[in-house]
């Protein structure tokens, strides 16, 4: 049975519904358009929830990336496109949950990798395609044969990569250094329930996008 909200919460709700909200929250921005909830960004377009981002567009929740497009939850990435939850990656494309990688395409849950394509769960690997190892020359020839300059060819190989991803289990949770938590993308937190994309949080429930 739902419990009534404490009086303090009711008062806060009334106040929140009465006081006008700002149209956007930004400071120290240079040459940016249609951005919000951002600080210390430069030459950006349609970027939301960003800090120290430069020369980028269509990002949500980014920190300290440069020349990135169409990505979500990126941190210190450069010259990358179409990614979700990537950290310190360079020339990374259409990849998810990757860290410290460069020159990878359509990879998932990979760390410390370079020149990999369509692979999942790799650690410190080079020249892998769909989780199979190749020589440098074989890798370059096979990727060239994919004809990624053609949108039709790329869409076909992307569908193949997504099906390959399904052959590997998803992580129960993305995070580390946690105690008694539930949700996803939780780091350095304790006693935190049903929360998402948080760092350094304790004794909390139902929160998101809190990075201390």
Regions found by a protein language model. Name each.
Residues 1-212:
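Long, distal/terminal scaffolding or interaction modules
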């Amino acid at each position: 049975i739902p419990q009534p909200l404490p009086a303090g919460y009711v008062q806060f709700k009334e106040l929140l519904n009465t006081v006008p909200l700002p149209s956007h929250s930004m400071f120290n921005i240079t040459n940016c358009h249609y951005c919000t909830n951002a600080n210390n960004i430069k030459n950006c377009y349609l970027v939301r929830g960003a800090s120290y981002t430069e020369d980028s567009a269509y990002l949500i929740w980014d920190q300290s990336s440069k020349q990135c497009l169409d990505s979500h939850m990126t941190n210190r990435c450069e010259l990358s496109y179409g990614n979700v939850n990537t950290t310190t990656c360079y020339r990374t494309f259409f990849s998810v949950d990757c860290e410290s990688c460069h020159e990878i395409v359509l990879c998932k849950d990979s760390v410390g990798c370079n020149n990999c394509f369509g692979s999942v769960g790799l650690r410190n690997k080079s020249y892998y395609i769909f989780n199979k190892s190749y020589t440098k020359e074989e890798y370059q020839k096979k990727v060239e044969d994919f004809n990624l300059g053609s949108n039709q060819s790329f869409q076909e190989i992307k569908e193949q990569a997504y099906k390959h991803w399904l052959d590997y289990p998803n992580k129960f949770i993305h995070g580390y250094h946690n105690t008694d938590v539930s949700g996803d993308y939780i780091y350095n937190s304790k006693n935190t329930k049903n929360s998402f994309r948080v760092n350094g949080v304790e004794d909390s429930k139902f929160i998101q996008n809190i990075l201390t």
